[in-house]
């Protein structure tokens, strides 16, 4: 099970304090935290091409946890890692991005997505 715990705007020095783990299949290929060519900082899922957690120097942050629901599994679903990179690389605010995502969420298997930008979470 993936876990994510955070504190937002509660510390005088740090806007975001985050503790997270990625509980994925051990044989799923990944690359550790690094700066991508497009400027974001994140690990990379080498199978799906996306990420589960990342930030952009412009102040954007996104994190994803998956949840498995065998009764509603979609074998041909889109990779959930693109949800994080889509927000980080896009121009939409967190609220606008989630509103847009509402229209296509059925294309993905189960997930929880946290997005933030400077003052908006």
Question: Could you say what each language-model-derived stretch is?
Answer:
Residues 1-121:
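N-terminal nucleophile
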């Amino acid at each position: 099970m993936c876990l994510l715990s955070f504190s937002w705007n509660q510390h005088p020095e740090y806007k975001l304090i985050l503790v997270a783990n990625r509980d994925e299949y051990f044989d799923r290929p990944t690359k550790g935290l690094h700066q991508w060519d497009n400027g974001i900082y994140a690990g990379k899922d080498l199978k799906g091409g996306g990420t589960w957690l990342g930030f952009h120097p412009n102040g954007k942050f996104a994190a994803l946890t998956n949840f498995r629901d065998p009764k509603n599994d979609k074998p041909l679903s889109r990779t959930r890692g693109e949800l994080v990179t889509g927000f980080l690389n896009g121009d939409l605010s967190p609220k606008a991005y989630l509103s847009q995502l509402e229209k296509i969420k059925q294309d993905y298997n189960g997930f929880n997505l946290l997005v933030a930008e400077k003052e908006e979470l």
